[in-house]
Regions:
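Juxtamembrane/interfacial segments at transmembrane-helix boundaries in multi-pass membrane proteins
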Residues: 2-9, 82, 99-101, 176-207
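Alpha-helical transmembrane segments
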Residues: 10-25, 99-114, 199-221, 281-282
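Membrane-water interface at loop-to-transmembrane-helix junctions
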Residues: 197-208, 236-261, 281
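Alpha-helical transmembrane segments of helical membrane proteins, especially in multi-pass transport
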Residues: 220-221, 227, 247-281, 289-298
Length: 333
């Protein structure tokens, strides 16, 4: 293989990565200005303020030392999240389909699990000043009950993150394997080849149900309303992000936008059969999917309260059952 033959795909991946990160920084502004603000009948912030300029602004903010038993590990978690999302992005890129150990659904699920687990660690490693006045119960000398376990906002957020990993991730991961059952392979290249021969999975009954289940899992993974329980402003405020400042907060903003784009590309590959090839017409389909999913999410979020356990568990259970049903239909037909 010549040097130029190897260089061109690498350059294409790098350019696509830069565009994906840029689009990811613009999407939050589109959500807030053109969807949520219109629903609430207000002008809304500039498109670039919520993502692009927010990430730049945080770079110039003063860093703080978190009140953590392992401050270095705590501050490294946003970087770990970004790396995990980057690996999912590389799995989706068609230039990497020859690397079977990378371009398969098992690897994608593993990297997404790393991203989810990071929030559990962040919550357990942070003990912010915001939690200092919320000790349960009274620890003042002479109190009736003493020596009880001190509870922190971040501990609550960490336990919620663990709950999201155990229960909330079922819909997304079931949806990912519906195209695999239909195509008979967990490798992205085979799934795309199947759809090129038989048509997009989303136009089948199993695929249509799977797309709905995927979207529910998409919102859960992004911790968006009504599933924003790990950083609910009403009780845990910012949750695991509480003590992240400066460049570490920039990584939080950057990673969320990048994850939105990456999940959109993953949906396009699995349910439509269009890989993100930069210099092809198919990239237009990918861009449409990337934009449509967060717009629908913003509409749902604008009309949704934060779910409590009473609403969260039935929603996840129903979505999981739909995912199982779709897999059964895909296996039979």
């Amino acid at each position: 293989m010549s040097y130029s033959t190897m260089l061109i795909p690498a350059v294409e991946v790098i350019i696509t990565l830069i565009l994906a990160i840029f689009i990811g920084l613009i999407i939050p502004g589109i959500e807030r200005r053109y969807v949520q603000a219109r629903i609430q009948q207000r002008i809304g912030p500039p498109v670039t303020s919520s993502g692009l300029w927010a990430s730049v602004k945080f770079l110039y903010k003063e860093n703080i030392k978190p009140n953590s038993p392992a401050p270095g590990l705590y501050k490294a978690m946003p970087i770990l999240c970004f790396i995990a999302v980057l690996m999912v992005f590389l799995c989706v890129m068609p230039q990497n389909y020859a690397f079977l150990a990378l371009a398969n659904l098992i690897a994608i699920v593993g990297f997404l699990k790393v991203e989810e687990t990071a929030y559990v660690l962040m919550g357990s490693l942070s003990k912010s000043v915001m939690s200092g006045g919320l000790r349960f119960d009274d620890h003042i000398k002479g109190a009736i009950r003493q020596g009880l376990l001190v509870s922190y906002l971040e501990d609550i957020s960490s336990s919620r993150s663990l709950r999201m990993i155990i229960f909330g991730s079922f819909p997304l991961y079931l949806a990912l394997f519906i195209p695999a059952v239909q195509s008979g392979s967990i490798y992205l290249g085979d799934i795309i080849s199947y759809q090129q021969a038989h048509g997009p999975v989303i136009f089948t009954l199993a695929g249509a149900i799977g797309a709905v289940v995927f979207f529910v899992g998409y919102m859960i993974l992004l911790n968006e309303y009504p599933f924003s329980i790990i950083k609910a402003k009403s009780d845990v405020i910012e949750g695991p992000y509480m003590e992240l400042a400066s460049k570490y907060r920039s990584f939080v903003v950057l990673t969320r936008g990048f994850l939105i784009v990456t999940l959109g590309l993953l949906f396009a590959v699995l349910f439509i059969g269009v890989p993100p090839k930069l210099f092809s017409l198919g990239i237009i389909v990918d861009l449409i999917v990337i934009l449509i999913l967060p717009v629908i999410m913003a509409v749902c979020s604008a009309f949704s309260p934060i779910f409590t356990n009473r609403q969260f568990y039935p929603t996840v259970l129903l979505s999981t059952l739909l995912g199982v049903l779709a897999i059964g239909i895909a296996a039979l037909f």
